[in-house]
UniProtKB/Swiss-Prot annotation:
Residues 1-13, 67-71, 126-289 are cytoplasmic. Residues 199-226 have a biased composition (Polar residues). Plasma membrane osmosensor that activates the high osmolarity glycerol (HOG) MAPK signaling pathway in response to high osmolarity. Belongs to the SHO1 family. The gene is sho1. Keywords: Cell membrane, Membrane, SH3 domain, Stress response, Transmembrane, Transmembrane helix. One of its GO terms (cellular component) is plasma membrane. This is High osmolarity signaling protein sho1. It comes from Aspergillus oryzae (strain ATCC 42149 / RIB 40). Forms homooligomers.
Length: 289
């Protein structure tokens, strides 16, 4: 599960504002309900359930914003918020028409809570590609800006540039024909061409492999990622992703496709598809199963 980070809330004006208003609304409803239950008769006991459920919603939404998992649990969030909307609305109906001011204040707290719930439903009930959601997220420090959306899916650059996949660049490989007399005359053991001082050594014989292998090593494999032997994790794609044609290490996949993952510590995960294709995939496109 994603770690809770207070910066996800403090750096997001939308999350900070809605959570703060919901806490204020709950405090008003809770304190007013206590005063009304003490001073007035016949306080509707059902409203206490509305107070308790509203507190659960606030705690749950704080956890969602803090872990930045709204896109993962969006459907469940909207379901719980819809139930909370019904409960708080019934609480308003049973309190706002009473004669004592404490009950009316509790009803006002439920009204304010209902307004926040409506905003949350509109936000989490929309896809991440919705224009209003992109506009809201543009003010957050930890989320993608509206320009990061394209082709029906967020750009993976929201998680930063892909880290280097090799510890050092592979050396350029040449043949003696390509060196054209510039090769070293000192003996190098372990390569074709005979032992040091051998009369059979020929300048036309490749010293560092044949040209096809040299060109392949120089151009095709210098950024190749070492392939892991184990894939202990399974992940499901929540968006479709098209690999960058300029990067042979990336892998394409479709929405809802199941991938095997070898390491989940970074922001780019080494993954393997069901057909055996391997490569790296952006972690914000995947959810662990």
């Amino acid at each position: 599960m994603a770690r809770f980070r207070p910066s996800n809330i403090l750096g997001d004006p939308f999350a900070l504002a809605t959570i703060s208003i919901s806490i204020l609304a709950w405090v008003i409803a809770f304190i007013s309900s206590i005063v009304s239950a003490i001073n007035a008769r016949g306080y509707p006991t059902y409203s206490w359930w509305g107070v308790a459920y509203s507190l659960c919603i606030i705690l749950g939404m704080t956890a969602v914003f803090g872990t930045d998992t709204g896109s993962v649990y969006g459907v469940a969030i909207v379901g719980y918020l819809s139930a909370g909307m019904v409960i708080t609305t019934l609480g308003v109906n049973s309190l706002v028409y009473r004669s004592d001011s404490a009950s009316q204040a509790a009803g006002a707290g439920f009204i304010l809570m209902s307004m926040v719930i409506v905003i949350w439903i509109f936000y989490f009930g929309s896809t991440p590609q919705a224009s209003h959601r992109g506009f809201i997220d543009s003010f957050a420090l930890q989320k993608e800006h509206p320009g990061a959306y394209g082709n029906g899916r967020p750009m993976s650059t929201a998680f930063g540039n892909r880290p280097e996949t090799t510890s050092s660049q592979a050396p350029q490989m040449y043949t003696s024909a390509q060196l054209n007399g510039f090769e070293t005359s000192s003996p190098v053991s372990g390569y074709p061409g005979g032992a040091p001082g051998s009369e059979n050594r020929s300048s036309s014989q490749p010293r560092f492999g044949n040209p096809s292998n040299a060109n392949l090593t120089a151009n095709g494999n210098e950024n190749e990622v070492p392939q892991p032997t184990e894939y202990p994790y399974r992940a499901k794609a929540i968006y479709s992703y098209d690999a960058n044609p300029e990067d042979a290490n990336e892998i394409s996949f479709t929405k809802h496709e199941i991938l095997e993952v070898s390491d989940v510590s970074g922001r780019w995960w080494q993954a393997r598809k069901s057909n055996g294709d391997t490569g790296i995939a952006p972690s914000n496109y995947l959810i662990l199963l």
